[in-house]
Every structure is written in C-alpha cells, then in structure tokens.
Regions:
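Surface loop/turn signatures of beta-propeller and other carbohydrate-active proteins
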Residues: 33, 86-87, 137-141, 191, ...
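CBM-like carbohydrate-recognition segments
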Residues: 11, 22-55, 62-83, 87-101, ...
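The tetratricopeptide repeat
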Residues: 57-60, 100-103, 147, 151-154
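Acidic-glycine-rich active-site phosphate/pyrophosphate-binding loop
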Residues: 29-34, 75-78, 122, 126-133, ...
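Extended ligand-binding clefts on enzyme/binding-domain cores
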Residues: 145-146, 153-268, 275-286, 298-327, ...
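Bacterial Sec-dependent N-terminal signal peptides
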Residues: 1-22
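Asp-box/WD-like beta-propeller blade repeats and closely related beta-sheet repeat scaffolds
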Residues: 116-155
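Short acidic (Asp/Glu) patches
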Residues: 11, 136-138, 207-208
Length: 362
C-alpha cells in the first residue's frame, strides 16, 4: 500500500512539474516573462548605458520589443540612446565599446534619423583606418572571444544599412584573425584569449580533470555573435558558408555538453568542478540554438528538445520580481562565484534574446 501511495505521489509531482514547464512555452507567457525581466532590469541599472554589458542587454531589450511590441520597452530604447547622445563608449579601437551600436543601428532603421548612427559611422571609420594603439604589444584587434559578439554585428549591420561592403570585408578579416588565434578545431570551441591556448609549456592552464579551459559565457558570446552576423549577411554573400559551418560545428559540440538540469556549467569541459548551472552562457546558447532551428540550419528533431530543456531551466532561474539569477559576474574564465542572487545586465539580455527565438517554435 505504501508503495502504491509513493508511486501516486511521484506521478502527481511529475505531472505538476510537466504542466508548469509546459506553460513556459505558451506565447503569452513568454511575452509576460520577457517584459517582467526586462522591466526589472531597467529599474535596476548597474553600468553606463553605452557600456559593453548594456550592449548585450539592449540587444535583448530590442528583441523583447520586437516580440512584445511594448511601447514601454521602445521608449526605454529611445531614452537610452538619447542619454548617450547615440555615442559609443570611449575606446574607438575596442570591440566592447561599439557593442551598444548594434542597437543604435536597429533603432535607426526604424526612425531614419542620421544622428542615431553618425557617431557609430565615425568610430567604425576610425577603427578601420588605424592600427590597434597599444604600444609594446603586438595584437590583433579582436584578441578575445567575447569580442565576436561585441564587434561583428555592429560592422555587419552598419555595412548593410549604409550599403558599404568595406565594413563587411573588415569584419570578416578581424573575425578570422580571432578564429585563427583562438578556435580549437578539435574541441570545436573558442579559448577565451591567448592565455588559454594550449602551448605545451609550463604556462598552460588546465582544469582539475586535466581538460583544457573553455569558458561557457565566452563560447556563448561567440554563438550569439554568429547569429547576429548570419541574420544580416545576404544568403548569397561569398563568406556566409564559413559562418554557417562554424555555427553548425559549435552547435553540435555545445549540445553534447549540456547538463541534466538543462544548463551548461561555467567550465564546459569540467562540469563536475563547477556545480550549478550558469545562466548567461546558457542563455546565449539557448538563443543561438533556437535561432538555428527556426532558420533551418539545425535539425529540429535533434536541437529543439535541447532548447526546450534549456528554456525551462532558464525560467526556473527567474525570481518572482523578474530578476534573472545564477549569472556569473564579469570575468574572463570559469568561476564558482555566483548564486541564485547573482545577476548582471548581460544575463538578462541573453534571457531576452533566447525568449525572442523560443517564442517562434511551432
């Protein structure tokens, strides 16, 4: 009798959990949680509006506005642009400082006001015309993998918008410099920067299990950035196949590293050393994989269940107020320094981008 009762209780719990997670995929519920998280984050700012962190956040806000058509969200976008005078951050040569320009360009496409992109045009023109101004260091312009989210979409969006192919060509040049430096073809993952590239000397960095260090959010930046490139490049653009193949190769690797709870760990190849899912990297993976399914680059039968598992887990990391938790703070490598109370604006941005694609599932 006790066994029957226990089985019945477990069955009820399973049904309840399944019903709850099923609600996460109802379009109106997706819109509701997107607005809830967006509004919480807008009320709790942490950085300068044109900081790189907000480059990711406002990309998510724009995606949330496209999804919900919320007037409040659109006004938040305009308020942000007006507060910065539509300017990038200070370092013209640094990919981080033009991340916000992705959203300026998106808004310009609607509003057609030149002042919304003029500073972006000026900054990108300077970037293309001058070497990286770090004396004593020989370095490429995009020398860390996070840059592949920050810079490429701005160059490609701008090139498409103003009909200047030079921006697209330079993006391809800078992207492939970073790819050649940091992409591990065997693992199909990016090292965060040159310090994490294995050289077989005493300066190598390894995880506790002997595996190489590949950071979840770093690779999330890359995959999210690839989506934002591919959304812009014409189907017949000569170098598009390179980006499509890289996207597919990374996607296949990434799904093999998903953990049982639906999230990825801060360290992709040593999950046991980093208990607890990390939401910013997982959010960008969810966004990228969902976009790949929606655009027929990834097999639906293989990838859709992965995305659904991730979206369910991401929703479970949103508290009642709308705060997206379990986000690793700003850094450059896997850490264990986050909890349910840890949040950052880019974590919310990743969540919003993911929702904007999950809602398109049929």
């Amino acid at each position: 009798m006790k066994k029957v009762v226990l089985v019945s209780i477990l069955s009820c719990v399973t049904i309840a959990v399944t019903a709850q997670s099923g609600k996460y995929f109802e379009p109106e519920n997706i819109k509701t949680v997107m607005q809830k998280t967006a509004k919480w984050q807008l009320k709790n700012p942490k950085h300068e509006p044109n900081d790189w962190t907000n480059g990711a956040f406002y990309a998510g806000i724009y995606a949330a506005w496209e999804t919900t058509q919320s007037e409040d969200l659109y006004m938040a976008l305009l308020d942000m642009g007006n507060s910065t005078q539509w300017k990038p951050a200070e370092l013209w040569y640094h990919a981080d400082d033009i991340a916000i320009c992705q959203t300026y360009i998106d808004i310009f496409r609607k509003e057609k006001k030149q002042e919304m992109i003029q500073a972006t045009v000026n900054t990108v023109s300077k970037l293309l015309a001058n070497p990286y101004p770090v004396r004593g260091i020989e370095v490429i312009k995009w020398w860390w993998c996070d840059a592949l989210f920050m810079g490429p979409a701005t160059l490609v969006k701008l090139g498409i918008t103003v009909k200047n192919d030079e921006y697209l060509k330079k993006n391809d040049e800078y992207f492939k410099e970073c790819y050649d430096l940091l992409y591990n073809r065997e693992e199909r993952l990016f090292a965060r920067d040159l310090g994490y590239v294995i050289k077989n000397d005493d300066k190598d960095r390894w995880e506790a299990n002997g595996k190489r260090i590949f950071w979840s959010r770093g690779n999330g930046w890359v995959m999210g950035g690839l989506v934002r490139i591919l959304k812009e490049l014409p189907k017949d653009y000569p170098v598009r196949p390179f980006y499509e193949q890289l996207f597919k190769d990374m996607a296949a690797k990434i799904i093999s590293l998903q953990q049982a709870d639906g999230l990825w760990r801060a360290s992709l190849l040593d999950p046991d050393s980093y208990p607890g899912g990390e939401v910013s990297g997982s959010g960008f993976f969810c966004y990228a994989l969902a976009w790949g399914v929606n655009n027929n680059l990834l097999d639906e039968a293989t990838y859709k269940p992965v995305v659904k598992k991730t979206w369910t887990a991401l929703n479970d990391c949103v508290n009642d107020e709308g705060r997206v938790g379990w986000v690793q703070p700003i850094g450059a490598d896997p850490r264990k320094n986050f909890t349910a109370d840890s949040w950052e604006v880019y974590g919310t941005g990743a969540f919003l981008l993911a929702g904007s694609e999950v809602i398109k599932f049929k």
